[in-house]
Curated annotation (Swiss-Prot):
Family affiliation: Belongs to the EVA1 family.
Annotated function: Binds heparin.
Protein name in the entry: Protein eva-1 homolog C
InterPro entries linked: EVA1_dom, Lectin_gal-bd_dom, Lectin_gal-bd_sf
UniProt cross-references to Gene3D superfamilies, sorted A to Z: 2.60.120.740
Recorded GO MF terms: carbohydrate binding; heparin binding
PANTHER family: PROTEIN EVA-1
Glycosylation positions in this chain: N62, N165
Membrane topology qualifier: Single-pass type I membrane protein
Keywords, ordered alphabetically: Glycoprotein, Lectin, Membrane, Repeat, Signal, Transmembrane, Transmembrane helix
Originating gene: EVA1C
Length: 441
């Protein structure tokens, strides 16, 4: 019930928003957010690939570090890899730890070298992920040149925990092989025999060495012989690796190696790219066969090919990042598919709206077309007599007439009939003409 003097105010009309306008405004915002997410994901992937490339570089390169007397020598490898000592030197060099070189001590620098350096570094740092070694003359045995400044120089590699190991007995042949586009990289090699190790080369009870007799120079021999090749063969004997043990001790060669992709090994050592392909060599080794003629498979080195072991180690070290990359790639694929479907549906709906608008502009077009079709069907002749055929012939010869032309034609026909009728009357004939004759004239 309304009170007198108070009138209800009409509701304020709300602006009507066209549904197509909202559909046109929303997609740019969604595409902007999608582009932003794509940039973030790509930056994460690039960062992950950079870290992975750095990881492989640390595994393949030779690392060299030094420390002077009184300092600590720090050796460290990335996760899922251990230290493999290649060489060690402890001696006198004034260029490394001192700016002056007294003339009286120039000759002593050649003889001031500790012979137990390599073995000591092996005992402290071999197969360790990190190693901190105090550089002091008492650590490496008797001081051969007291009072002089000395330093420790170590060269090492970081070998993955999961590598290929091969042991070959003395007087047997060592064969190393990698698949296409991958080449050998030797991490460690020892030739000899350990004291407490059982004999893996013979079932007979043989003489055991009283001490570990190992030759670490086997690493240099195998590196010169097999590094950067796909196949390598060598006879394990004292001629190639020397004789570190006493006579009668059965020795064996233990090798740790990996097959590294060509592009990664070339990035570390460009000299690998200059190697020329060769056939079988005289001593039984196999050269690198970059383009075998018998192979019909198209070979293509990927831009980002990695060692399967290193990739597995990287995924284990970064599970969250690997999961993020996988989920992000799936999301990007779904988002692109959704965008394609949305664009397709939007375009189809806009096309239908446009077609409907055209039909509304010409509402009677369909009806006019139907009427014209009915008229054409009615105009077909139903009889086969001569007047019907003649009239049909006339219609086909004059398909379309305007109203003015039709009036002129009717007037001409009427005049012609009058003239013909006058001629018949003047000639004294019957004035009645056949109907079909008048139509003929």
């Amino acid at each position: 019930m309304l009170l007198p003097g108070r009138a209800r105010q009409p509701p304020t009309p709300q602006p009507v928003q066209h549904p197509g306008l909202r559909r046109q405004v929303e997609p740019p915002g969604q595409l902007l957010r999608l582009f932003y997410c794509t940039v973030l994901v790509c930056s994460k992937e690039i960062s992950a690939l950079t870290d992975f490339s750095g990881y492989l570089t640390k595994l393949l390169q030779n690392h060299t570090t030094y420390a002077c007397d009184g300092d600590y020598l720090n050796l460290q490898c990335p996760r899922h890899s251990t230290i493999s000592v290649q060489s060690a030197f402890y001696g006198q060099d004034y260029q490394m730890c001192s700016s002056q070189k007294p003339a009286s001590q120039r000759e002593d620098s050649l003889t001031c070298v500790a012979a137990t350096t390599f073995q000591k570094v092996l005992d402290e740092c071999q197969n360790q992920r990190a190693c901190h070694l105090l550089v002091n003359s008492r650590v490496f045995g008797p001081d051969l040149c007291p009072g002089s400044s000395k330093y420790l120089l170590v060269s090492f590699k970081c070998q993955p925990n999961e590598l290929k190991n091969k042991t070959v007995c003395e007087d047997q042949e060592l064969k190393l092989h990698c698949h296409e586009s991958k080449f050998l990289n030797i991490y460690s090699a020892t030739y000899g025999r350990r004291t407490q190790e059982r004999d893996i080369c013979s079932s007979k009870a043989e003489r055991l060495p009283p001490f570990d007799c190992l030759s670490y120079s086997a690493l240099q021999v195998l590196s010169r012989r097999c590094y950067g090749k796909q196949r390598c063969k060598i006879i394990v004997n004292n001629h190639h690796f020397g004789s570190p043990c006493l006579p009668g001790v059965k020795k064996y060669l233990t090798v740790t190696y990996a097959c590294v992709p060509k592009n990664i090994l070339t990035a570390i050592d460009p000299a690998i790219a200059n190697l020329k392909p060769s056939l079988k060599q005289k001593d039984g080794e196999y050269g690198i066969n970059f383009d075998p003629s018998g192979s019909k498979v198209l070979r293509k080195d990927g831009i980002l090919v990695s060692n399967s072991l290193a990739a597995f180690a990287y995924i284990r070290a970064h599970p969250e990042r690997a999961a993020l990359l996988f989920v992000s790639s799936v999301c990007i694929g779904l988002a692109l598919t959704l965008c394609a479907l949305v664009i397709r549906e939007s375009c189809a709906k806009d096309f239908r709206d446009l077609q409907l608008g055209r039909e509304q502009l010409v509402p009677g077009s369909d009806k006019v077309e139907e009427d014209s079709e009915d008229e054409e069907e009615e105009e077909d002749p139903s009889e086969s007599d001569f007047p019907g055929e003649l009239s049909g012939f006339c219609r086909t010869s004059y398909p379309i007439y305007s109203s003015i032309e039709a009036a002129e034609l009717a007037e001409r026909i009427e005049r012609r009939e009058q003239i013909i009728q006058e001629i018949w009357m003047n000639s004294g004939l019957d004035t009645s003409l056949p109907r079909n004759m008048g139509q003929f004239y």
